[in-house]
A protein has these predicted regions:
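Short acidic loop-to-helix transition motifs that present clustered carboxylates
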Residues: 9-12, 128, 151-152, 176-177, ...
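Flexible, low-hydrophobicity surface segments
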Residues: 1-90, 113-116, 198, 264
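Short coil/turn connectors at secondary-structure junctions
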Residues: 1-2, 30, 37-40, 46, ...
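Gly/Pro-rich active-site capping loops and adjacent beta-alpha segments
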Residues: 12, 50-72, 96, 153-154, ...
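Beta-strand segments within the central parallel beta-sheet cores of soluble alpha/beta enzyme folds
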Residues: 7, 167-174, 201-210, 237-242
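Helix-loop-helix junctions that connect adjacent transmembrane helices in secondary transporters/permeases
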Residues: 80-162
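Glycine-rich and small/hydrophobic secondary-structure elements
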Residues: 21-51, 180-232
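Alpha-helical support elements that line or immediately flank enzyme active sites
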Residues: 1-7, 42-61, 133-199, 256-261
Length: 275
C-alpha cells in the first residue's frame, strides 16, 4: 500500500469542470454524491492485487436522498437544487434561442404542416481504448501523459486542483484511441496528477470497461417537439422546435451540446426557424 487519499488531501480546488467548476475531484465527507462515478477516495498501491484488497476494506455510510432523474423533474419548482452553491437559481444550465425570420407566420400560411415529438436516448461512446493517464513529479509540479480530447482543459483543471500555476502542469497527449466526445472531461488525469504530486512517485490510473461506462459522461438524451411546414409542391418553408437536453449531474459541455443541437436541428434546408 502506498496511501489512501480523500478530498482533504487536495491542495487546490476540490471542484473542477469545463464550463462550471461543479465536479468534485473527490466528494468531501458529508457532501452529496451526484452519480455512480463520483470518487469518494483514492487508493494507491504497488500491485493490482493489493489495490483490490485495499478497496474491499473501504466502508462508506450513505444517507439516501430523493434523486432527480430527468430534466423535467429538475425543472419543477420544488425540485431539489442539484448544485445550490454554484447555480442557486435553479437546475437549468443553459438556454439557447435561434430565430431567423418570422417562422410562425410562414408556418401558419403554409399549405401543409406536421408536428411530431421525437426522443433520443443517452448513448455510450464505446471507444476502443479505455481512459488511462500516467503522471509523475516534475520540476515542483507534475508531468501527465494522457489520452483525452482536451490537453489544455486537462492542464487547466489539474493546475486548479493542485493549486499550481499552469506552467507547473505539463500535459502530453498520446494517441486518443477513440473519443467521439466521451473523453472531453477529465476522468483519470486529475486523480493520477494528485497522487503523483502527493507521493512524488510515478502513478498510473486506468479504468476497466465497466468503470469507464460508469464514469464518463454520455451523449445527451434529448426531447424535441418539432413543427415543419411546406408548400403545395413539398418545398420546406419553415420550422419551429423546442429542444430539451439532459446534461446529467454536471455541466460538462452541456451548453455547447444544446447549442449544436439547435443549430443543426433544421439542417441546411430551412432559412426560417424558431428554436
Amino acid at each position: 500500500m502506498i496511501g489512501v487519499y480523500t478530498a482533504d488531501d487536495i491542495p487546490g480546488s476540490v471542484k473542477v469542470g469545463h464550463l462550471k467548476p461543479d465536479w468534485d475531484t473527490m466528494i468531501p465527507v458529508g457532501h452529496v454524491t451526484h452519480y455512480l462515478g463520483d470518487a469518494i477516495c483514492l487508493i494507491a498501491a504497488e500491485t493490482p492485487e493489493i489495490l483490490e484488497r485495499a478497496k474491499a476494506l473501504v466502508k462508506v455510510d450513505y444517507e439516501v436522498l430523493q434523486p432527480v432523474l430527468d430534466p423535467f423533474e429538475a425543472l419543477k419548482e420544488d425540485a431539489p437544487r442539484i448544485h445550490p452553491g454554484i447555480q442557486p437559481d435553479g437546475n437549468v444550465l443553459a438556454h439557447e434561442h435561434l430565430v431567423r425570420g418570422n417562422a410562425e407566420e410562414v408556418i401558419a400560411n403554409s399549405k401543409y404542416k406536421v408536428t411530431r415529438h421525437y426522443e433520443t436516448p443517452w448513448t455510450e461512446h464505446a471507444f476502443l481504448e479505455l481512459e488511462c493517464a500516467v503522471a509523475m513529479p516534475f520540476d515542483d509540479g507534475v508531468f501527465i501523459y494522457s489520452s483525452d480530447q482536451g490537453t489544455y482543459d486537462t492542464q487547466h483543471e489539474c493546475s486548479m486542483m493542485l493549486g499550481l500555476p499552469p506552467e507547473k502542469v505539463i500535459v502530453e497527449n498520446k494517441l486518443v484511441g477513440g473519443g467521439f466526445g466521451g473523453k472531453e472531461d477529465v476522468s483519470v488525469q486529475h486523480h493520477a496528477a494528485l497522487v503523483a504530486y502527493l507521493t512524488k512517485r510515478p502513478v498510473k490510473v486506468k479504468l476497466s470497461r465497466q468503470e469507464s461506462i460508469t464514469v464518463h459522461p454520455k451523449r445527451h438524451p434529448m426531447w424535441m417537439d418539432i413543427t415543419t411546414a411546406c408548400d403545395e409542391n413539398g418545398y420546406l418553408t419553415a420550422m419551429k422546435a423546442v429542444v430539451v437536453s439532459d446534461t446529467g449531474a454536471y455541466a460538462s459541455l452541456g451548453g455547447p451540446v444544446l447549442q449544436r443541437a439547435c443549430t443543426h436541428a433544421a439542417g441546411p434546408y430551412l432559412s426560417l426557424i424558431h428554436i
